[in-house]
Structure formats: C-alpha cells, structure tokens
C-alpha cells in the first residue's frame, strides 16, 4: 500500500511538472506572438496600411495568434499562405524575407551575374509580390528580369533558360482558394528546385530572422542601375516558335483549322493570351472564349 502511495505521488508530481511546463510554454508562446504583433504595429519598417489592418483585429486574440504564432513556412515548394498582415501570412514583408534568403543562396553560388527571371499569375497582389521579389534581388546586386504582365509557369521555365538565369520565381498559389497566394522557386534547368538545393535554400531563408536586414530599393533606382528589366514580347515570340516545333502532325492542323470550332475557358488564368495566340498563329479561325472567364 505504501509502495502504491509513493508511486501515485510520483505520478502526481510528474503530472504537475508537465502541466507547469505546458503552462510556461503557452505563456512564452503568447508573449512571442503578442510581441510580434506589437512589433509590426509599432516599428517604422511596416507601412501604415499594414498597421491599420492589424489595428482592426486588436480585440480578436485568436486571429492575432494565427497571424503571428509562427513564420510562414518556406518549404520545398516555396511559400504558400493566406494573404494578409502577419508573420504567418503572404505579404510584401514575408515575400521580401524569403527573397533575401534566396538571394543569399544565389550569391554563395556565384550566380549574381546570371540574374533571376520572375513571373506571376492573376491572383490578388501577384504583381506587387513579384515587384518586391525583384527589388530585393536588385538590392542584392542580382538582376531581375520581370514579365510585364501575367504569364504561365511554363513560359517562366522557358524564359530563365533562354536568358541564362540562375533561378526563377513564380508568384502563384496554384489550385488554392482565392484568399491564398504563393511563391515558387525554379533553378537554371527550368525545373522547381530539388534536393539538395531545396533544403539549402530553406536553410538560408530560415537564417533571415530580422526584417531590418532584408535589402530592397526603389524601382527607379533599380532600373537606372540596370538591375530591373521588363521582359515580354521577345520571350513570347521565342516561346511560341518553340511550341510550334512540338506539333506532331502539322499537316492535319492545316486540313482542319479553317472549319474546326474550339471553345476555350481560361478560368481567369495565365493561359488566356498565350493559348489564344498560338491557336491563331496555327490558323484556327473559330476559337470561342467564355467571356465570364476571361
């Protein structure tokens, strides 16, 4: 009986210690995300629009915690998350931070002179995020080749190989809901980064812990320095010509192009212009696009 009592006492003490440790972790966690929230509210680094968004959730503890309890993870596929203010959201600051990590990796690889190609899709803030990535690269001495409007991911892959870039960035969240956006990294072979590069880049991104160490510059200064260059029609033409080389039976297209009717639904996506262009250049005269999905 005495032995059972001692055993029960030991179990109780262990339970209390676990609860105390858990409570301490919760307090530390709460302090951490609240400290981050206050930092974003008070530090001059963050713009007024971001601060106003955060002020609106001042009474919503759960929302504050969800936005700040961790950093938005940079995984093997890059970034992906809900758009909004906070360390666990897609915004210009988390995009800059991720880009600084990628820039650090590129510099260590000696690839600054090759530059980086950047494309983006039709999601909310995609052009802005692409610009922020480009200006961070430029501030690190890495030239950014930025598409002048949205382009499909395969064309980004083509562009970075055509231009001889060391890396490429696509701002997209693929199939995720509209409140999401993302950021994918490609390497000089035109494919998404794979092991061991993906983990090496992740390590560089995770080492960027202070927003004030992230470099950026104005677009005017970047363009004047030759570190920001728009790309577009010249890449489109080269891409279309390469696509035409992949046609298996061009003679069949010539036979049916005048009469074949095609309905195309772009779903508001990046394929809208290039698909219609290649079909037109191949001679298809009856291509109908669903207006509500342009």
Segments from the language model and where they lie:
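Secondary-structure transition/capping motifs at alpha-helix termini
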Residues: 107-111, 136-145, 163-167, 211, ...
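Short polybasic linear motifs
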Residues: 13-16, 20-21
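An N-terminal, well-structured beta->alpha segment
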Residues: 32-133, 225-259, 270
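Ferredoxin-reductase
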Residues: 39-43, 111-188
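Short, small-residue-rich loop/turn micro-motifs
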Residues: 76, 120-122, 173, 291-294
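Gly/Ser/Thr-enriched, mixed-charge loops and adjacent short helices
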Residues: 63-68, 72, 181-294
């Amino acid at each position: 009986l005495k032995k059972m009592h001692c055993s029960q006492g030991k179990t109780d003490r262990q339970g209390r210690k676990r609860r105390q440790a858990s409570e301490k972790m919760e307090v530390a966690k709460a302090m951490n995300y609240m400290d981050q929230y206050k930092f974003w509210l008070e530090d001059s680094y963050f713009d007024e629009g971001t601060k106003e968004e955060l002020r609106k959730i001042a009474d919503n503890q759960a929302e504050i915690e969800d936005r700040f309890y961790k950093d938005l993870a940079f995984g093997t596929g890059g970034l992906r998350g809900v758009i909004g203010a906070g360390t666990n959201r897609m915004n210009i600051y988390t995009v800059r931070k991720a880009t600084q990590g990628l820039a650090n990796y590129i510099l260590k690889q000696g690839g600054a002179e090759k530059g980086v190609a950047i494309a983006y899709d039709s999601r909310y803030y995609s052009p802005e995020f692409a610009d922020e990535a480009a200006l961070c690269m430029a501030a690190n001495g890495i030239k950014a080749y930025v598409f002048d409007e949205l382009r499909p991911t395969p064309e980004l892959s083509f562009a970075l190989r055509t231009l001889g870039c060391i890396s490429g960035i696509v701002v997209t969240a693929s199939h995720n809901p509209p409140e999401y956006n993302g950021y994918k990294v490609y390497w000089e072979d035109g494919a998404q980064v794979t092991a061991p590069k993906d983990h090496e880049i992740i390590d560089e991104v995770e080492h960027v812990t202070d927003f004030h160490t992230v470099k950026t510059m104005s677009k005017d200064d970047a363009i004047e320095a030759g570190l920001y260059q728009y790309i577009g029609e010249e890449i489109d033409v080269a891409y279309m010509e390469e696509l035409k080389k992949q046609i298996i039976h061009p003679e069949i297209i010539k036979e049916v192009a005048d009469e074949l009717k095609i309905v195309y639904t772009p779903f508001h996506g990046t394929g809208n212009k290039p698909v219609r262009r290649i079909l037109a250049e191949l001679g298809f005269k009856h291509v109908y696009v669903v207006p509500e999905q342009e």
